[in-house]
């Protein structure tokens, strides 16, 4: 695309997505999650957005985890999070949990966004991650961009930093 200066630039683009709310209160500062096990070091590594804001989770017991309670309606919800393994954690299993619904996968060597969609029953229950599961004391994993939203698919990441009720991105 020729510009005024005659230099071709990359193709302009827009992200067209519906309005969504990230219901997680602390999507990057995971150490602030209300229910957790393990040691959490915020701003430990470079995240997928290119800044120093990924959290390192270190196993101090069998299964490190973090959870937040969410008030659900009887509709579809999608959880998503970016995960990157360190050392011996690569290839171990982790679980994304929405209430009693569990998605299991393996911890990758490179940053990967994992997504899990499920229809929930109405009520208040937890959303969380157990990583790795099972763990050995000292296992380390990087996490970033923890998101839970109403909808049958994940949209682009919506950062939150302690806002009660989450953050809404307009359409």
Kindly give the residue locations of the regions a language model identified:
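Extracellular and organelle-lumenal recognition/adhesion modules and their flexible linkers in secreted
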Residues: 1-171
